Amino acid sequence: EKDENLWVGIVTGAGDRAFSAGNDLKFQAQAGGKMDINIASSGFAGLTSRFNMTKPLIAAVNGVSMGGGFEIALACDLIVASTNAKFALPEPKVGLAALAGGMQRLPRQIGMKKALGMMLTGRHVSAEEGMHLGFVNEVVEPEKLIEAAKNWARQIEECSPMSIRATKQVAYENFNEPDLEKSM
């Protein structure tokens, strides 16, 4: 946010196996839902509890994106996924809940019924299904993932940074305003 030379960011995992597998949910469940982990006030990866980011963020999802990892991806503005990406909020399978924004963001992005279908079952969703559901913007082969994310970033960089920031701000601030006139 503070770097004036940076207009857009890309968040990705190391390697091709996982974007982020999230917390060790079985260990956390065995600990009664409590773990001695230090999560910044800005949330997982410094993103899930930040609601006023002015610069666009692109999640380049390579492989597994589960639990907190999926919540990180959902906190980004765009998701580009490799064909081997898998998404889920599996917390209910071990007696936990996705408390880093996943339960709030997913229904807003794909609708309540589709989101509940994922959240109440903890089922895994492929990149293709994620695109069909509406939370993935593009699906590419794993070796093309970073280049595809950079392509989205280049398209954003071709626009005015002030216009991009204003567009993002207005879109997020008015997302839940049902009255069109009030949202204007």
Predicted regions and their residues:
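A short, well-ordered alpha-helical element
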Residues: 1-7
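CoA-thioester-processing core
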Residues: 44-54, 60, 66-120, 133, ...
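Short, active-site-adjacent cap segments at secondary-structure transitions
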Residues: 16-20, 66, 88, 171
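Terminal peptide-recognition signature
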Residues: 11, 24, 73, 106, ...
